[in-house]
Amino acid sequence: MTSLQIRKLTYAALYLAIALVLPFVTGQIPEIGSMLSPMHIPVLLCGFMCGWPWGLAVGLIAPLLRSVLFGMPALIPSAVAMAFELAVYGAMSGLLYAILPRKPWITYAVLVISMIAGRIVWGIARVILAGMTGSSFTWALFISGAVTNAIPGIILHLVLIPVLVMAMERAGLSLNKPKTAAR
């Protein structure tokens, strides 16, 4: 393993640990704790800072591991659907951030695209899981889960994540280097 690979592995492990612990902090606010989507923050940051493979891996593992270790979220359907959603968050944020120019507005665009793609995948996963378990997942449940109940988390992510990404870039902590065109 190269030094860069070891650093990415270390950063990814840190983001995974934060994803496991952060829900305990927001869970202390019963009214909006889960609506803040605390596990999403370190997964998105991992994608931005470490690249798409690490963001995908942390996103896929975090909800499943948290479910097994702490019983929350429930494994089926929540943790499984979240695993697909967060894997897309981490992969999209890492991939788009590497190929697009590094400008502040691009960070917001990457974040919004990643969030939309992740929510769509979450909805698809929930529909498939509902079919497998014999339950139902309606359009109203999708809108409620992906948009209405998620508004506090969406706002938090749009405010916090770009600021953290820009600060970490300035501090030289990003390991997700821009892809340059072949000459």
Region spans (language model):
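Membrane-interfacial segments
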Residues: 26-34, 69, 73, 96, ...
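Short helix-perturbing small/polar motifs within transmembrane alpha-helices
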Residues: 7-21, 58, 79-127, 165
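Hydrophobic transmembrane alpha-helices
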Residues: 1-49, 53-54
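Alpha-helical transmembrane segments and their cytosolic interface
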Residues: 1-16, 104, 137-183
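Hydrophobic transmembrane alpha-helices of multi-pass small-molecule transporters
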Residues: 41-44, 63, 67, 86-90, ...
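Alpha-helical transmembrane segments of multi-pass integral membrane proteins
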Residues: 31, 43, 77-85, 110, ...
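Hydrophobic alpha-helical transmembrane segments of integral membrane proteins
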Residues: 19, 34, 38-39, 59-60, ...
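Interfacial aromatic-anchored transmembrane helix boundaries in multi-pass membrane proteins
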Residues: 21-36, 61-96, 130, 140
